[in-house]
């Protein structure tokens, strides 16, 4: 059985900061709490026997840093492969804007539809069909290995960690081919530092759990 862990990077704003909509064009590092969340992610993976065999992130520093810290805290020395398909979405005119300005432009209803149904607001430079295709292709490759000697494709069993951002993570459950059922059972957003777990068994993907928030107080 292949296990796919989707994790959101840790915090990029401190408690007293004014947060903005951080997208693909805003490359921010983790703040101290974000580093603690990354460490808690690693501890969670270790405690729950979810040590990753392969690790991926986006090309943005907040995801690479989260992955690196998580691996340090779960004792895994695997490299982190940064892929652009996991970069956060481009929020267009709302990139790096405060939430009140975003709502003033697109309206609260559009933002609610984004958070509950993954319907992309007008003006954002993002194609959800491309994101879904990327997840499907990645998930398919994650479950198969090609034996170049025999030219046979085998099913594989491993644990894969992907550290990405909120906008991209919500499209991962499309690999189950029943996103509506997922959205009825779970909130589609991942909190900062949170993770979701998908498993491939009986030739299909299932969401085992979503928006798990590891306790940063556990060392």
Q: Residues of each region from the PLM?
A:
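Acidic, low-complexity terminal tails and accessory targeting/binding regions
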Residues: 1-2, 76, 89-103, 155-158, ...
């Amino acid at each position: 059985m292949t296990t796919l862990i989707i994790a959101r990077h840790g915090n990029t704003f401190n408690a007293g900061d004014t947060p903005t909509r951080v997208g693909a064009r805003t490359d921010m590092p983790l703040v101290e709490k974000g580093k603690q969340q990354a460490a808690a992610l690693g501890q969670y993976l270790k405690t729950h026997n979810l040590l990753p065999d392969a690790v991926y992130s986006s090309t943005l520093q907040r995801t690479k840093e989260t992955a690196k810290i998580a691996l340090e805290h779960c004792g895994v020395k695997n490299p982190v492969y940064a892929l652009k398909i996991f970069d956060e979405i481009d929020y267009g005119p709302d990139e790096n804007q405060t939430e009140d300005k975003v709502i003033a432009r697109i309206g609260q209803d559009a933002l609610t539809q984004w958070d509950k149904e993954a319907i992309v607001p007008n003006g954002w430079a993002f194609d959800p069909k491309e994101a879904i295709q990327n997840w499907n292709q990645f998930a398919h490759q994650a479950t198969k290995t090609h034996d170049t000697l025999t030219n046979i494709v085998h099913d594989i069993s491993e644990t894969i960690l992907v550290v990405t951002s909120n906008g991209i993570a919500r499209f991962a459950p499309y690999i189950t081919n029943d996103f509506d059922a997922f959205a009825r059972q779970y909130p589609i957003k991942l909190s900062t530092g949170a993770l979701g777990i998908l498993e491939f068994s009986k030739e299909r993907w299932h969401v085992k759990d979503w928006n798990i928030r590891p306790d940063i107080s556990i060392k």
